Amino acid sequence: MSVDAFIAYLQLEKKYSPHTIKAYNKDITAFTSFCQDHHQLNGIWNVNYPLIRNWIVYLVEKKVSNRSINRKIASLKAYYRFLLKIGDIDTDPLANHKALKVEKKIQVPFSENEMWNVLNAIEYSKDFTGARDKLIIELLYTTGIRRAELLNLKVVDINFSTKTLKVLGKRNKERLLPIIEHLENTLQSYLNLRNSIKKVAAEEYLLLTNSGDKIYETLVYRVINKYLSMVSPKVKKSPHMLRHTFATHLLNKGADLNAVKELLGHSSLASTQVYTHSSIAKLKEVHATAHPRNKE
């Protein structure tokens, strides 16, 4: 069966982002190619688990990480659940599959000092590009929004009267985020220069390229890497790391976990609890001041 119906289902019913749908499609296409090349199968709707296990072994031999393999399997699981739902298959070949073990890495966020430096010590150019670049970093750090949410922000989402920013999150769920004074100033500076762009092709979108088009993913990564490399030796620099830093800094300052969950747009508290593992410095500080052995 063609995956077209599945892709439409992800778009229309599940409301997945284009980025997520692209990843699902890529994983299913790769598995389809494996079945054709190694097992002479023209479709993947009637495969069994031993064949899928062969694919997993093939990926392991190709040095694909367990984390990546689990993601690929998750794409297939979603596809087979869909086929089961619409009655195209009778059994799910991945129903009893257990995810491969993945070593949990504690990601260390950027420090408060690094974030202060990138937003205050660095001198951004006074033109449109400098204002936009600073706004990208300021938005990601002070609101904790996702990369896709950043790309899709619109001018009308900003309400200076209520000092709130409307964000359209996963599955089209809206949430309002506070606009703090620093962010408000950066927004105003950017908007003043934004109006000077000769050609505004994507007028409704907040963040634009120098030619007036909607910004794209690679540009965001380039901006983050450029400026954070000036203040931090960390290798990994990404929109998600700034989101991670946002959550960790809030929790370090005693923010309520449920409040952070709402700010991040998480549907479950379990997703937010991941960030509590990063508050090592705060835990050490509490331990040092509270434990009797540290007072002897």
Model-predicted regions and their roles:
Residues 1-296:
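Conserved catalytic core of the tyrosine transesterase superfamily
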